[in-house]
């Protein structure tokens, strides 16, 4: 009887609530319905805050400014000479290098929500954001400080990520960010590392084998499959899940072990100036899973809203985030990924969406 009254009083709301109950909204990569997110986060965050962490933790960003004429000159020179048959899908797409000032907002989120971070490193190719004044807390690191000369310049994120452990003075424990990943709420250090140094492994519910069976063809999937194959061969451990598209807690010593064990495999793809289907994705797959196998990482939960910043759905995601901000139910993080140029000129749209969200 109560349902009938509700239906006749406001049929549109009744139908909306009925559909939401039957088909819950899922915006994250762990198959958690929107109305259950905050319950899980509240309990997780309480547990993650119980034991203090007394070791230093750094943050590492990789960043590029595609509007820099000198960078464009280098990019165009090597783009014209590359064999397009051997580069991965979207590897030459300008969207991979587009700058919408995401770093300004992502860096601001780290400073605001992760105040316990010791130092922030921004890895670039002879660039520095014009709005940034580096200091002891925020340092800009050039590729030449990490990567051997014969592999430079490189426009391959997998090559850059393979050398993160060579950042001068980097802490043993660090968190790797792409500049399109944003911390959405205050988080304790325990969200990323246990007090005994074990790293969080933010595992997705997605399946590598399912994506492959569907015909997905990207350098990221190829690198994950190749990495999983190597680990399965050496440790008899089958891996079928990628990580959530968010920040990645890492340990410098595990990079060193990975290089010791797989130096030949790593060296093989370092000459690839653009991403190919023969790369390994060390920072975002190989090393996190090697860390798990070695017992220094454990599966953990990060509720991250992941969406294509160029798609029509982007505005809906930002609206959901704005509503969650008002209700105090924001996820741990979100990723406004810019992965192809089907939308011809999204620059102002993406910049406006970010500006509107962070100005609220």
UniProtKB/Swiss-Prot annotation:
Its EC number is 2.7.-.-. It is an enzyme of class 2 (transferase). InterPro entries: Stealth (IPR047141), Stealth_CR1 (IPR031358), Stealth_CR2 (IPR021520). GO terms for molecular function: transferase activity, transferring phosphorus-containing groups. Keywords: Exopolysaccharide synthesis, Transferase. Belongs to the stealth family. PANTHER family: N-ACETYLGLUCOSAMINE-1-PHOSPHOTRANSFERASE SUBUNITS ALPHA_BETA (PTHR24045:SF0), PTHR24045. This is Capsular polysaccharide phosphotransferase LcbA. It comes from Aeromonas hydrophila. The gene is lcbA.
């Amino acid at each position: 009887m109560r349902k009938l009254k509700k239906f006749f009083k406001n049929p549109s709301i009744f139908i909306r609530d009925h559909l939401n109950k039957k088909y819950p909204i899922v915006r994250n990569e762990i198959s958690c319905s929107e109305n259950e997110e905050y319950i899980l986060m509240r309990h997780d965050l309480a547990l993650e805050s119980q034991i203090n962490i007394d070791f230093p933790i750094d943050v590492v960003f990789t960043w590029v400014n595609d509007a820099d004429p000198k960078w464009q000159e280098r990019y165009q020179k090597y783009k014209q000479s590359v064999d397009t048959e051997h580069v991965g899908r979207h590897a030459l797409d300008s969207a991979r290098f587009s700058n919408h000032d995401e770093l300004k907002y992502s860096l601001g989120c780290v400073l605001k929500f992760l105040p316990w971070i010791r130092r922030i490193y921004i890895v670039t190719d002879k660039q520095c954001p014009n709005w940034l004044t580096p200091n002891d807390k925020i340092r800009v690191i050039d590729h030449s400080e990490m990567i051997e000369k014969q592999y430079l310049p490189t426009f391959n994120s997998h090559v850059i990520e393979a050398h993160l452990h060579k950042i001068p003075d980097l802490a043993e424990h660090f968190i790797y960010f792409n500049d399109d990943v944003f911390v959405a709420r205050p988080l304790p250090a325990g969200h990323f590392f246990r007090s005994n140094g074990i790293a969080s492994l933010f595992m997705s519910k997605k399946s590598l084998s399912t994506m492959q069976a569907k015909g997905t063809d990207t350098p990221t999937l190829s690198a994950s499959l190749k990495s999983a194959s190597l680990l399965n061969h050496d440790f008899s451990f089958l891996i079928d899940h990628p990580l959530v598209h968010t920040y990645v807690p890492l340990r410098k010593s595990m990079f060193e072990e990975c290089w010791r064990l797989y130096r030949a495999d790593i060296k093989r793809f370092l000459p690839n100036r653009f991403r190919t289907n023969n790369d390994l994705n060390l920072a975002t797959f190989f090393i996190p899973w090697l860390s798990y196998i070695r017992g220094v990482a454990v599966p953990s939960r990060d509720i991250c809203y992941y969406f294509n910043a160029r798609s029509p759905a982007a505005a809906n995601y930002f609206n959901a985030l704005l509503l969650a901000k008002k209700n105090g139910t924001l996820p741990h993080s979100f990723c406004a990924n810019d992965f192809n140029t089907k939308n011809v000129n999204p620059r102002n749209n993406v910049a406006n969406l970010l500006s509107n969200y962070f100005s609220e």
